[in-house]
């Protein structure tokens, strides 16, 4: 590619005498290889454009920048590469000045548009990661199309100096008809300025943007890991063994609601030692379960404050045998029970008993004072409401985490794709621009074979870009396989 003065023809002044040596029968294998690269570049970029057009999943705002990049790469493969190959095997330019200017214009415009397309793609990814909510309202196809048109407009500005340089500088040297070169091929200050604007400045900005993107994605991943640590994404399901069953038969260790009791406070503000649990992670009791192993579900729930009540006097109790497996015969009135179920705002891991086992409770397992029948029914009703509230909050939490996970995955995939595109772009173009800066100040340092190699290395970037998309994007990969009838 030829940002400033990339055409190999334009370097004849710097590498005089080398072109005749290159135009020999030994170039035939090289011409075959370069022609193959040109054909592959055209085919791959046409495949990208057809894939985006035919697959609805690829009709996204971000892929508009990919389309712009593919169009620029397609021009490089279909126009710039073939004419460069043609000029490579000729000892002199014999196609006329108009065709020469057309080739130079396409070379400069397409190569610059390719660079600018990568640049605006990087900006889009940066804003999507750094300002997701604000940029989401701004990120529309209309605005993306306007940005792309702006990049191409700036690229087409190359036509002005290519076609009209002699109008601005009357002292421009007279050009030979057998050479295809720009009027400013020997204007060092202009070439250096355009090299900085077209390559060095965008590259530095893209590297800065990508570092920011990488840090943001890494920060989001760490934040999500911390969030998942306090709010598990999935229910923790454990199979209770016989040991757990035997441990649940011990009196005083059970909660009829399947929720661990919090230590209640006495009127003086101290903790009631009777209600203090030894293990904060005690699982739900087995008093409501059937014989054998059962399944308990541990869910992050809201703490349930259970007020400590006075036990029923021994003379009022009925069914002493059942007392070992029931509520330890609490004597409660409706007012005290209404205060037994205060839900705390902070969430912690609690263990809820399986509601199905709760419904299978036998009469002997739940023998309570007859006067507490209404209280029992109301308590179950309150427990059901509490369970629904907790379940609803958990569903909302899972939904937020799911959406956040999808957004994070998109960020990571987009960052990976952009990183590959930038790496290929820099590796392909940095040799040319380094060599260009050297020969801009040292004409005798020019080597035509080296210069041609750096130019074609830049051209190959247009071949690599379409290969990067399916490697970094699953939708592109599936669409390519579908179009090419490749079975997974």
Swiss-Prot record:
Residues annotated as binding histamine: 107, 112, 198, 432
Subcellular localization, as worded in the UniProt entry: Cell membrane
Role this protein plays: G-protein-coupled receptor for histamine, a biogenic amine that functions as an immune modulator and a neurotransmitter. Through the H1 receptor, histamine mediates the contraction of smooth muscles and increases capillary permeability due to contraction of terminal venules. Also mediates neurotransmission in the central nervous system and thereby regulates circadian rhythms, emotional and locomotor activities as well as cognitive functions.
GO molecular function, a single term: calcium ion transmembrane transporter activity
Residue ranges annotated as Cytoplasmic topological domain: 51-64, 124-144, 212-417, 471-488
Biological-process GO terms, alphabetical: calcium ion import; cellular response to histamine; G protein-coupled receptor signaling pathway; manganese ion transmembrane transport; memory; positive regulation of vasoconstriction; regulation of synaptic plasticity; regulation of vascular permeability
Segments of this protein annotated with the region Important for agonist binding: 107-112, 425-429
SS bond list: 100-180, 442-445
Free-text note on domains in this protein's UniProt record: Histamine activates the receptor by forming hydrogen bonds with transmembrane domains 3 and 6, squashing the ligand-binding pocket on the extracellular side and opening the cavity for G-protein engagement on the intracellular side.
Record-annotated membrane-spanning stretches: 30-50, 65-89, 98-123, 145-164, 189-211, 418-441, 448-470
Protein's membrane topology: Multi-pass membrane protein
Region feature (Disordered): 245-337
Effect noted on mutating residue 263 to L: In strain: C3H/HeJ and CBA/J
Protein family per UniProt: Belongs to the G-protein coupled receptor 1 family.
Name of the protein described by the UniProt record: Histamine H1 receptor
Phosphothreonine carried by residues: 140, 142
Disruption phenotype: Mice lacking Hrh1 develop normally and are apparently healthy and fertile. However, they display perturbations in the control of circadian rhythm and locomotor activities related to emotion. Learning and memory processes are also affected in these mice. They also display decreased sensitivity to the toxic effects of pertussis toxin.
Stretches with biased composition (Polar residues): 322-337
Keywords annotated in UniProt: Biological rhythms, Cell membrane, Disulfide bond, G-protein coupled receptor, Glycoprotein, Membrane, Phosphoprotein, Receptor, Transducer, Transmembrane, Transmembrane helix
Cellular compartments per GO CC: cytosol; plasma membrane
PTMs per UniProt: Phosphorylation at sites in the second and third cytoplasmic loops independently contribute to agonist-induced receptor down-regulation.
Chief subcellular location: membrane
Glycosylation sites: 5, 18
Consequence the record notes for mutating residue 312 to M: In strain: C3H/HeJ and CBA/J
Pfam families xrefs: 7tm_1
């Amino acid at each position: 590619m030829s940002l400033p003065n990339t055409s190999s023809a334009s370097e004849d002044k710097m590498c005089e005498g080398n072109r005749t040596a290159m135009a020999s029968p030994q170039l035939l294998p090289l011409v075959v290889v370069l022609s193959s690269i040109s054909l592959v570049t055209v085919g791959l970029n046409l495949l990208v454009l057809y894939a985006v057009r035919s697959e609805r999943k690829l009709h996204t705002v971000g892929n508009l920048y990919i389309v712009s990049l593919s169009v620029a790469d397609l021009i490089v493969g279909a126009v710039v590469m073939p004419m460069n190959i043609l000029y490579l095997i000729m000892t002199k330019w014999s196609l006329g000045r108009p065709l020469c200017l057309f080739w130079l214009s396409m070379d400069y415009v397409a190569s610059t548009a390719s660079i600018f397309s990568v640049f605006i793609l990087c900006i889009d990814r940066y804003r999507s990661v750094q300002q997701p909510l604000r940029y989401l309202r701004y990120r529309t196809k209309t605005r993306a199309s306007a940005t792309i048109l702006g990049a191409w407009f700036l690229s087409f500005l190359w036509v002005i100096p290519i076609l009209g340089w002699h109008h601005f500088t009357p002292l421009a040297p007279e050009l030979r008809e057998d050479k295809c070169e720009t009027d400013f091929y020997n204007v060092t200050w202009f070439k250096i300025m355009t090299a900085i604007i077209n390559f060095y400045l965008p590259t530095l900005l893209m590297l800065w943007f990508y570092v920011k993107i990488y840090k943001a994605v890494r920060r989001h991943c760490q934040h999500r890991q911390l969030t998942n640590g306090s709010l598990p994404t999935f229910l923790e399901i454990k199979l209770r063994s016989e040991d757990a069953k035997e441990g649940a038969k011990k009196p005083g260790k059970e909660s009829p609601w399947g929720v661990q009791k919090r230590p209640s406070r006495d009127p003086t503000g101290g903790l009631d030692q009777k209600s203090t649990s030894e293990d904060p992670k005690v699982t739900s009791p087995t008093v409501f379960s059937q014989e054998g192993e059962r399944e308990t579900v541990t869910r992050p729930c809201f703490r349930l404050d259970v007020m400590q009540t006075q036990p029923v006097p021994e003379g009022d109790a009925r069914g002493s045998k059942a007392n070992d497996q029931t509520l330890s015969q609490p004597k409660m009135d409706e007012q005290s029970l209404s205060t037994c179920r205060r839900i705390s705002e902070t969430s912690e891991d609690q263990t809820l008993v399986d509601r199905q086992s709760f419904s299978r409770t036998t009469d002997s397992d739940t023998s309570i004072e007859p006067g507490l029948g209404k209280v029992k029914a109301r308590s179950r009703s309150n427990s059901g409401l509490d369970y629904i509230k907790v379940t609803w909050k958990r569903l909302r939490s899972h939904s937020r985490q799911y959406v956040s996970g999808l957004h994070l995955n998109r960020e990571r995939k987009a960052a990976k794709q952009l990183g590959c595109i930038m790496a290929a772009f820099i590796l392909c173009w940095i040799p040319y621009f380094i060599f260009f800066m050297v020969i801009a100040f040292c004409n005798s340092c020019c080597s035509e074979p080296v210069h041609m190699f750096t130019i074609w290395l830049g051209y190959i970037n247009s071949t690599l870009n379409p290969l990067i998309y399916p490697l970094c994007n699953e939708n592109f990969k599936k669409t390519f396989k579908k179009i090419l009838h490749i079975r997974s």
